[in-house]
Amino acid sequence: MATRYDAVVIGAGPAGEGAAMKLVKEGRRVAVIDQLGEVGGNCAHVGTIPSKALRQTVYNLMRFRRDPLLSRMADIRSVPLSQVLARAHKVIETQVSTHHRFFERNDVDLYFGQARFEEPNLISVLTPEGITERIGFEHAVIATGSRPYQPADIDFN
């Protein structure tokens, strides 16, 4: 027996979250499916958030070293990379936790695994544990991200 929803959103990144929240605000019962096993999409886990967190940490260290007053307070000439990476991971954890609360607070059901359309209004989700869950729906939103197009005659490097 399939669990029924008004709408199902495939992808728990920024676009999927936005679509889910809009649908919930319209009074729809919504499920979100993501294959990563966590909300936030590539933006939170391998893209924008990690790179910006690393950049900000390095920027702050450089600023600290250049400030005459602050640089006398502590010696930060050598900060272990493990500490810099730990800071980035903390930022990611905070982002994921925040977005998880958005889904919970708005009663959006989360499914983690690979989604597959079985019929026009039925999706199966194969979980990492090997369990198949069936989800019936009226409307579907596919928000699985994109990749940049790279024309053959343009060097991206």
Segment roles from a protein language model:
Residues 17:
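Residues forming the Rossmann-fold NAD(P)(H) cofactor-binding site
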